[in-house]
């Protein structure tokens, strides 16, 4: 007999008939992803919060993004894990809307943060003399507010007003909606709107800004090289070191952006294309793409650990319990702060 998610069979979603071994493997993999996401981003949050040397405008923006990446491990992934492994939703229709809204909000907020970080890096590399005047703590607070509020209004407004399936109500209620399910469904209009708002527009801004930074940094490197060849070694070497550090930061954040695009691009492309293809993408594939997107929140701290020496030193201090020592917050994580 085919398993169902609800007692009333004629309105119930169909439960998958995977073996217990398959389910156990899926749960183990997803628990590992969740724990890695939580621990990695928590280390970033604690590091920036604890060490006073890291209290810079850019790092507070990174702190906020780490919080955005941390929250899916608490609020989204555990419930998505059950839905993916069982193909059933046991938490009620209201919580389904809350879960879906939170999921969309946090994924959108992550790329909003990356967009603002790219702008921050643009001024740090391309206009360093006026960087601290232009990107002060007030500007960072505005960036953080926009990065959280706009995705929240967009996601919760769309889901709770049921605008996500507006124009495709007949398809949704006849072929998708069932008791014990929590499918992420978009009509043609809402799919395009979500793609543009959460992915394409902010992603395009990032790509354009980083390309502009690359061109300017490349030109700066050429000028510094020419100046050094004219024996202006003292001052120019200092400027060269500073610009080298900025370019390294740009490269690191560019990799973070690239990881985001690689992780979320398949999901957003399917989201915008599926309604025009008459919803041919199976739910299982959609689940896989969603979890592939979640991996973005898992990978970001790994990028920090690989490229940021201050992150590795902070991690060592945490592992050995040194952050509990007196005045540990004033510990020097590096000799010279970058912007």
From Swiss-Prot:
Q: Quote the protein name from its UniProt record.
A: Trace amine-associated receptor 1
Just give the chief location class: membrane
Extracellular compartment ranges equal: 1-25, 81-98, 158-188, 274-287
Which segments cross the bilayer? 26-46, 60-80, 99-119, 137-157, 189-209, 253-273, 288-308
SUPFAM superfamilies per record: Family A G protein-coupled receptor-like (SSF81321)
Role description: Intracellular G-protein coupled receptor for trace amines, which recognizes endogenous amine-containing metabolites such as beta-phenylethylamine (beta-PEA), 3-iodothyronamine (T1AM), isoamylamine (IAA), cadaverine (CAD), cyclohexylamine (CHA), p-tyramine (p-TYR), trimethylamine (TMA), octopamine and tryptamine. Also functions as a receptor for various drugs and psychoactive substances, such as amphetamine and methamphetamine. Unresponsive to classical biogenic amines, such as epinephrine and histamine and only partially activated by dopamine and serotonin.
Residues carrying sugar: 10, 17
Give me the Cytoplasmic side stretches, as residue ranges: 47-59, 120-136, 210-252, 309-339
Question: Which cysteines are cross-linked by disulfides?
Answer: 5-178, 13-88, 96-182
Q: How does it sit in the membrane?
A: Multi-pass membrane protein
Q: Tell where it localizes.
A: Endomembrane system; Endoplasmic reticulum membrane; Cell membrane
Binding-site list for 2-phenylethylamine: 103
Its Gene Ontology cellular component terms are: endoplasmic reticulum membrane; plasma membrane
> Which terms under GO biological process does the entry name?
G protein-coupled receptor signaling pathway
**Species this protein is from:** Pan troglodytes (Chimpanzee)
Q: Which family does it belong to?
A: Belongs to the G-protein coupled receptor 1 family.
Superkingdom field: Eukaryota
Keywords carried by this UniProt record: Cell membrane, Disulfide bond, Endoplasmic reticulum, G-protein coupled receptor, Glycoprotein, Membrane, Receptor, Transducer, Transmembrane, Transmembrane helix
GO molecular function of the protein, one example? trace-amine receptor activity
Look up keyword Glycoprotein and say if it applies. yes
């Amino acid at each position: 007999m085919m398993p169902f998610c609800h007692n009333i069979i004629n309105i119930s979603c169909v439960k998958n008939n995977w073996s217990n071994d398959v389910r156990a493997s899926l749960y183990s993999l997803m628990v590992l992803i969740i724990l890695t996401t939580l621990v990695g981003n928590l280390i970033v949050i604690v590091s920036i919060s604890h060490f006073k040397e890291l209290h810079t405008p850019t790092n507070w923006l990174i702190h906020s993004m780490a919080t955005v990446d941390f929250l899916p491990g608490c609020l989204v992934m555990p419930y998505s894990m059950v839905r993916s492994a069982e193909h059933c939703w046991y938490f009620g229709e209201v919580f389904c809307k809350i879960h879906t809204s939170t999921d969309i909000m946090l994924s959108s907020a992550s790329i909003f943060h990356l967009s603002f970080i790219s702008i921050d890096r643009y001024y740090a590399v391309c206009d360093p003399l006026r960087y601290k005047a232009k990107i002060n703590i007030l500007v960072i607070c505005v960036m953080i507010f926009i990065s959280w509020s706009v995705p929240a209004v967009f996601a919760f407004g769309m889901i709770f007003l049921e605008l996500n399936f507006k124009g495709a109500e007949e398809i949704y209620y006849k072929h998708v909606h069932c008791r014990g399910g929590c499918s992420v469904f978009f009509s043609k209009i809402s799919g395009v709107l979500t793609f543009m708002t959460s992915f394409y527009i902010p992603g395009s801004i990032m790509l354009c800004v980083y390309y502009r930074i690359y061109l300017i940094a490349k030109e700066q490197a050429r000028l510094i090289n020419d100046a050094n060849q004219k024996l202006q070694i003292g001052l120019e070497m200092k400027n060269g070191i500073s610009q080298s550090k900025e370019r390294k930061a740009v490269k690191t954040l560019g990799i973070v952006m690239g990881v985001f695009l690689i992780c979320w691009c398949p999901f957003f492309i399917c989201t915008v294309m599926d309604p025009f293809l008459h919803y041919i993408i199976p739910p299982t594939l959609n689940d896989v793409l969603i979890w592939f997107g979640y991996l973005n929140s898992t990978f970001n701290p790994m990028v920090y650990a690989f490229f940021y020496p201050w992150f590795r030193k902070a991690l060592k201090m945490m592992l050995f319990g040194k952050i509990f020592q007196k005045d540990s917050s004033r510990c020097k994580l590096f000799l010279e702060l970058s912007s």
